[in-house]
Design a protein with these regions (language model features):
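Conserved PLP cofactor-binding pocket of PLP-dependent enzymes
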Residues: 114-132
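Short amphipathic alpha-helices in soluble, non-transmembrane regions
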Residues: 105-114, 143-149
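Short beta-strand-to-loop capping motifs
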Residues: 3, 96-100, 132-134
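Active-site C-terminal subdomain of aminotransferase-like
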Residues: 2-70, 85, 154-156
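Short amphipathic beta-strand starts and helix->beta connectors
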Residues: 73-80, 111-117
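Short, flexible, solvent-exposed loop/turn segments with mixed acidic/basic and small polar residues
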Residues: 48, 82-87, 119-122
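Conserved PLP-binding catalytic core of the aspartate aminotransferase-like
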Residues: 80-111
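PLP-dependent enzyme catalytic core of the Aspartate aminotransferase-like
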Residues: 126-156
Length: 156
């Protein structure tokens, strides 16, 4: 930034420290090193979202993926039971329980054998947690649902 020193010295005090020119003037531009890798990664993610239709398209895709998995839970005749109330369900992390902890352990083991890793729930909550973040394709969610149905039929 090229500016008169008197202008830089009179930064409004209500402006956050990191956004005030006088902060950097007093510290010879060395007040803080920006998190370069984090900034780089945010740029990559934003570019990817734009290339894939933008936020509206991403929201539609995520809603469709979540619906697919939640429908498998809701239509399982009680074999799978969701943790969250229907009006509070996440589009990113679908959590559910099985009839017993033994079946949950078996589900996690067999899911891994079918290429579906990381489905074990949080240690304080238990059950299953399937993460279907933005980059997870619909095909991955369909593979999960297919496995869930196969597992349910074999273990009901």
């Amino acid at each position: 930034v090229v500016a008169r020193k008197s202008f830089l010295e009179n930064s409004p005090k209500e402006v956050p420290t990191m956004l005030r020119y006088d902060t950097y003037l007093k510290k010879n531009s060395l007040y803080n090193t920006p998190p370069a890798f984090g900034i780089y990664m945010v740029g990559k993610v934003v570019s990817w979202i734009k290339a894939n239709g933008g936020l509206e398209a991403m929201a539609k895709k995520n809603a469709a993926k979540a619906k697919l998995v939640y429908d498998a839970i809701d239509n399982s005749d009680g074999f799978y039971v969701g943790h969250a109330d229907k009006d509070s369900r996440s589009f990113m992390n679908v959590t559910f329980r099985l009839p017993s902890e033994e079946l949950e352990a078996k589900f996690a083991k067999e899911a891994l054998e079918h290429g579906l890793g990381g489905v074990k729930g949080h240690r304080s909550v238990g059950g299953m947690r399937t993460s279907i973040y933005n980059a997870m394709p619909m095909e991955g969610c369909q593979a999960l649902v297919d496995f869930m149905e196969k597992f349910r039929k074999a273990n009901k």
